[in-house]
Amino acid sequence: FGVLSQAREDEADNDQENETVKEVMLHIPFQTAPSPDLDGDGIPDALESDGDATDPNSDWDNDGVSDIQEQAIGSNPYDSDEDGTGADFVANAYPNKFDLDSIYGYVDEEQTFNLVVSRSNYFLRGLDPNSNFEEAQEYYSNHDFSSFIGETLFNGEVTIDNEEQLFRDNEDDPETDVDESLEVTSRLAPGIHVPLDNAFFQENILDKEGQTELLSQSNFRNFLRGIHLSGTNADDLMFLLDLTQANITITYEYDDYDSEADEIVTAERDFVLSFLSGNAQSGISGNAVNVFENEMFPNPDIANALDNGENASRIYVKGGQTLAEIRLFDEMENGGSDIINQIKQNNWVINEANLTF
């Protein structure tokens, strides 16, 4: 993970690089569809009132500078304290806002839920052994993974935020008039962004350097099989997550030799574990499974009426759990077979059919 392989580190003439985890972050972005901006002022229409959505001279933050002007100078249209005239102003250094239409039940920016991230010990194989490994393995939403949940990596509250996260990694150059430390070097889309347990990744990633667990991709996938996500206090929320952009970033430090200064210095690197790759056009590589825990109908009369082999007088449907079948033409009742035969004999083409309750 440093400059030298573990085998080189273990040689007598070389010092250990002492790779140490500094930070581990899990990022799973929300799916965000392109949001229209009819007036071209840089603010999505979904975040503006009906009148402002078509008015480029609207002023979202009421700072006296129109949204279209703030877009031109690169000032923050959502912050009334920034209008581009400050002495320390840096253009385009503010977080963009997004319309989070991929979250069902999302009400406001202060909404929270509790998230538990754990190690998964269940191996999500890609091919089905029952088909001689010629077909993809199928997984169903009622599968029980509870006995395969390992160590807890995070357990805490997550706040839903529709803003990007900004990173400023530059150091200020004292010889310039601009404060480079205020410049945005990278942006992170809105989503779940939480720290994970450093000790776990120190033990299971960095300390495994040179061992069989990291010898090949197949060995690593069998060793670290995945993560398990579960939420509480989120009964009214449903998320669409973009797992193709999700990752775990391990930031670590190690001892490096500076040949010019002839000394050991502390260097820093990132190691990124991605979840899925690809897209709908090229295909998705990797496996992810979503499961649902559904309670049965609370009314015992409804539960007893389901799947009892008898024709029901009523139809009960529960999303994600039950299936209702309706027989339209019973062969023995209401002349059903005669109706079907008449349609066939006359070669009638049915353009439209409606079922009315």
Where are these regions (language model features)?
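Proprotein-processing/basic-patch segments
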Residues: 157, 161-308, 315-317, 348, ...
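Structured segments of extracytoplasmic/periplasmic soluble domains
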Residues: 4-7, 27, 31, 46-50, ...
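A short beta-strand-loop element at or near the start of a globular domain
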Residues: 1-33, 89-94, 196, 207-217, ...
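Extracellular structured ligand-interaction cores
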Residues: 21-23, 74, 110-115, 224, ...
